[in-house]
């Protein structure tokens, strides 16, 4: 039996595979103190991964880390070691050096406070940048980041993976005209951040995925284990987020429509988000607008202001005006 044709064919497939990998966009990760960097890298870099997303791969990392947040300080070294087991990944001492050696950037720091500083180093490059939640450690920082992106004509987007989960859950669901929605999810609080920025942002992003922009007022009820945040939209629709503490970390959604009320199953996972990220890197077209992301951040900031005022309604526009970059 002549094996030469088979051997040649296998060699060709191997060569094509190498060329395809060589054409992948080179991605740099900034801030290695979150489990997202491990999950994202496996999904992008490992063709054998269950939910592998092709088209980009992590080749550069910058450690970062925040000593005053235990979940950052206690994990950043271990996550860094795990990432450096990939032979294609190089650790850089500065963000500037990382940016020079990649095509696109993912700001991943679990701590939103350094995101503005990182953005100031990355966005002048013009390279497409995904910023993991939250965009910034405050509404003021978040507004400044998007202003910087506009100044340098650099495409930016931010999203929780729960956005894509909601989109998938509602793909073929009919409910007529949207009247409102309720979401729920975990809402652990980190003292260095506005209350909902840390974990409640997932359920808030779920709400905005359904409702879109246009929230006028926000009102919050707060107890030790629960936050209930209600937004009233300009057209009269009402959206509610319930953030749970000391309960099972589940996510849920109910959509109220003119013809139906639906509560679809929410299936979580990172692959749908990463498919959006890779497409964004390739096209430079953000799948989520700056307007929507900034209103989401303002919604959560308004919830904190409502808490400070004893649960009084707060106008989103007033919160935005009070948090313009200095």
Model regions and ranges:
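C-terminal segment of classical bacterial N-terminal signal peptides
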Residues: 15-21
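C-terminal helix-rich "cap/oligomerization" subdomain common to oxidoreductases
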Residues: 105-106, 282-326
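Short helix/strand-capping hinge loops at secondary-structure junctions
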Residues: 126-128, 133-134
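A contiguous active-site-proximal alpha/beta segment in oxidoreductase catalytic domains
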Residues: 135-193
